């Protein structure tokens, strides 16, 4: 028999003491169905084959530096952000106190995807 995993995002935010960067988005009914998380480096580069979109997505220092470079090409950036957020991901967590960009806020709110933050390092948060 398959184990079923389900937790409300609201509970995860509380338990992990996450900062909600998108308070306009209602997190009370968003469910997390996977215990595993995903670092979306390949997706942010535009490769979406075998994307684990049902997992919590975490952006650390490496992804953040790449996103800063990506935002120099507005057309490519918007295309990647549209694909990423339109895939129905449950949320994105930024580690190390990293702040999402204005462009990411806009697209995340468009697709109702919460952006969250933690002061913890990526590996520490993932453990």
Where are these regions (language model features)?
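Gly/Thr-rich phosphate-binding loop signature of adenosyl cofactor/nucleotide-binding cores
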Residues: 1-85
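Charged, amphipathic alpha-helical linker segments immediately N-terminal to NTP-binding catalytic cores
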Residues: 88-127
């Amino acid at each position: 028999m398959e184990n079923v995993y389900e937790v409300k995002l609201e509970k995860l935010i509380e338990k992990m003491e996450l900062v909600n960067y998108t308070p306009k988005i209602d997190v009370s009914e968003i469910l997390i169905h996977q215990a595993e998380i995903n670092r979306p480096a390949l997706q942010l580069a535009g490769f979406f084959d075998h994307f684990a979109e049902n997992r919590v997505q975490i952006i650390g220092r490496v992804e953040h530096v790449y996103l800063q470079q990506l935002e120099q090409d507005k057309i490519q950036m918007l295309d990647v952000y549209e694909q990423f957020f339109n895939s129905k991901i449950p949320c994105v967590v930024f580690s190390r106190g990293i702040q999402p960009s204005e462009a990411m806020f806009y697209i995340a709110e468009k697709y109702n995807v919460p952006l969250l933050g933690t002061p913890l390092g990526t590996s520490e948060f993932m453990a």
